[in-house]
């Protein structure tokens, strides 16, 4: 036992190490972080993890998910953490003496909105009194409800997935994300069901009346926190004035599309107090799962909602606070083990 402990201490720093990869996409430099487990396998599962609005690739791994690389090492997963486009918008505030001061803040996002509204531009995504976000430099003539960048993130993520699938022996591929990253993950599942085998959307309900449905079967876990006011799982109206599709509508449409024949409702008390609805015996043996955590808000299961707004040294060019180490992967086990089992 002591020998195992000493070996773990020797290799622990390498378990959490990642490589930063930069590629050219659509005339711009884009980057992602790559984690490869120490265990060698004939075939790996690939997981792509997408940070939330104003998050970072390294912040998603370190804080948002409670140190996802620990789970990836445990399961022998190859993980990619893409970085969303970001900029530093200015805003007005006051100094301690009450004098006006102009400051800047880091803002990042994934463009899930562009493809969703392409043929539905008349759908109203927010109330007139909504809290509008600073427009991204890549956006031209977008209305006040449009709060993401306007680059082709769908193709960027697809390009990464195909690149990794070519470079490594990949069995199955999955995409997951939190909030804006969850919205993007669901969109990727809708657009590329031939490339990905499953989606995990955490607190990322898509816009009301715009939530996408894939043309081909793909497994989905969609998770919401009952106390979430930012992107509520059961109500259309959010605290910020944006309109979101309730979880029950999304899973109803997906399960109907994939001809799911059976449904199972469960109450879970460990590791979280949650209600789960599982749709199974669907086309291609996919499963659709809705999870609502009764005691959680806008966060990854088991993690508080203020985590992930940071960066680690591997992304030192980002002007942001440095991430702390969080080692709490019960939420990742809770979600990923369910997806892998079905």
Task: Annotate each PLM feature.
Residues 3-13:
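Sec-dependent N-terminal signal peptides
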Residues 14-46, 54, 58-78, 149, ...:
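A domain-start/cap signature at the N-terminus of enzymes
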Residues 23-33, 42-174, 187, 191, ...:
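Serine-hydrolase catalytic machinery in alpha/beta-hydrolase-like enzymes
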Residues 39-40, 53-55, 85-88, 227-229, ...:
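Acidic glycine-/aspartate-rich tracts in secreted/extracellular proteins
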Residues 44-47, 218-219, 288:
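Alpha/beta-hydrolase fold active-site loops
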Residues 50-55, 162, 168-169, 178-180, ...:
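Cell-envelope and extracellular/periplasmic
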Residues 73, 197-285, 292-295:
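The feature captures the conserved acid-bearing segment of alpha/beta-hydrolase catalytic domains
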Residues 134, 139-141, 255-342:
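Alpha/beta-hydrolase-fold serine-hydrolase catalytic core, especially in secreted/extracellular enzymes
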